[in-house]
Structure formats: C-alpha cells, structure tokens
Amino acid sequence: MSTGRKGMDRRSVIAGVTTTGIASLAERSAHGASETSLPGSTAVPRNFPPPSTISKAAQDYLRKGAMQPPPAPVPAPEDVAGWHAYVAAGNAPLPVEMILKIPGVDVETRQMGGATVYLATPKGLSEADRRKAHLSIHGGGWVLFGGRHAMALAKITAMQYGCVTYAVDYRMPPEHPFPAGLNDCFAVYRALLKDFGARNMLVSGGSAGGNLAAALMLKIRDAGLEKPSALILQTPVTDLTNAGDSWQVLYGLDPVLRDPDGVGSTELYLNGNDPRQPYLSPLFGDLATAFPPTHLITGTRDRLLSDTVRMHAALRAANVEADLYVSEAMPHAGFGQQTPEDQAILSDTRKWLNGRWPRA
C-alpha cells in the first residue's frame, strides 16, 4: 500500500478502516487525471485545501491525494494487453501478502455455483455467529482486486465485522464484461441461500461492488428468491450514465475518481449495453420488493455522492427502509487509512446491523 509512511504496523492496515477505504489507496492510482473540462459541461478540476472539520489524518490523506501525479491514460476497450497492464498497476499498491499473514482469520478457496469464493472465518466465533453469512462484493471499477487481492479483502472484511465472510472473486473485463460478474454473484448467493437461509445473510459491496450488490437485489427478486436480511452499499455506483450532479461538481476534489469523463472501465464493463438497464444502473430499476433494509455510505467529496443520495431517495420512495451516512469531506471509498472518520463509519455500520442481521 502506498501511504508515504515507513515502518507501518501490519495491524494499522486494517484497524478501523472500511474495505473500500483500504482499496481506495490502490484504486486511486488507476484513475486518470486531466486538466480538460468534462465533456458537455463547463466543469474544470478544482482543488481546495482540506477543511478543519476533519481529523489531521483525514486532512493528510486529502493533501497526499491532491499531490499525486496523473497516471497513464485509460486504455481503449479493445486494448486487452493495455488493460492487463492497467490492472497490474492498479493492484500493485495493496499489500496483499502482508494482509494474508495477519493471524486471527482463516481463509480458504471454494467453488460455489461455478464461481470462485474466498471463505474467511475469524477464530473463536460463537455458534450463533457461525450461522450467519456475509456475502462481500469487492470494488475496483469492475477490473481491479481479483485473485489474491480479493482474498486479502475478504480477510479484512471478516476481521472488521467479526463474521463468516464469503467474498466473490467474480469474473471481470476485459475477458468477461457484463453480465459475467453479476451472474457469478447471483450464483454464489443462491448457493449460500440454501446453506444459511435469507434471514441469516448480509450482502455488501463498495464502489463497483456496490453496483453489483444493488443489481444483485433486482436479480434475486426477478428470480423469485428471498432477499437477504440486510444490504450495505459503500459509495456505490448506481447510475452508469454519470448524470449525477456531484460527478461534475466534485471533479478535482475527489482524489480517487479523477477520470474526467468517467468512461474507462465503465465502457469496458458495459460492452455496448444500454447503461440505463437496471442490472447495470440499479437506480433506474423497480426497487419495490427487491431491497432489504439498506445502509448507504458516502462523503461530501465523493464524486458518487449523487449516485448514493439518489439511490437512497429512490429506496425511500419505494418504501424500503434505507439509512444514509454522509462523512464530512470524505472522498470516494473512504480515507484509505486509520482515521477517526473510518472508525466512525465502521462503528456506525456495525451498530446499524444490530437487530437487522440476522433478521428477527
């Protein structure tokens, strides 16, 4: 993980930090920066100093993000070799082997419904906790954090939530665009449903993983299956048309999502499909009866702030129990290190889960 700090203790990597926040350190290196205006708008990249209303650690994260050099341009969709290099560069900062050596959680690889899954089990779980299952869907723009990276993120998630975690290593572009990843997530959910029952299941996803998690709810409903006990969406992508206000207004203020027009891996994932299709942009779906109680997380510097608040409003309009946590000055996917803000998000999320998972 590229943090600019030496001698970082292994446990500081995971303490009080959301999975998407950790991943954002790597993810932000894979999003291009530009000094040009957004297409069809007058927006230009801006930079304001971090506010005094957040912790020093969070301020430092924003300052470092503002100073990072622009990475190489995003490859064209047909440039398979270019995408492989892009993914390798984006994955490199995550300290996978260091995370996997941290004791306290056993991780094993399984095949479920034809998909690869990493089962992470904290040591010393009670029998009641062993009866619960957390289906975790990683982010990374539909292209990053597969393989051992997904395994490491599974371990972190299990440690944070103190539960059995099933992390889907879903297929990704360039070889496997939509709907391959969503189909993998659905296959794993269906398999877990037989073993645990819906009342004992939690589904979560961050960023692109939040997109897949939300789309999964629609697919579960459409298949006539029972929805999980609860859903957590961390800075989710819900509208692939990039129509939200914050996508333009926060251009230059979010150190993670710096791609000026937002195509890149989105275009690769779409593979020519209509971005307004609900399985691609869940915001445009019929949300009624599809979603369990849902907890959404975003920040005031997250370029997907609009995606998150619009999804929250749409869920409320569909009479779904939905809660929204907005963190001051937080960019996409969190502050990426051990900050009071990251700890507050995790604490609030765990508190929200009480009484909702397992469902009474």
Language-model features and meaning:
Residues 146-147, 154, 166-200, 339-341:
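Catalytic nucleophile-loop/oxyanion-hole region of alpha/beta-hydrolase
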Residues 2-20:
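N-terminal secretory signal peptides and thylakoid transit peptides that target proteins
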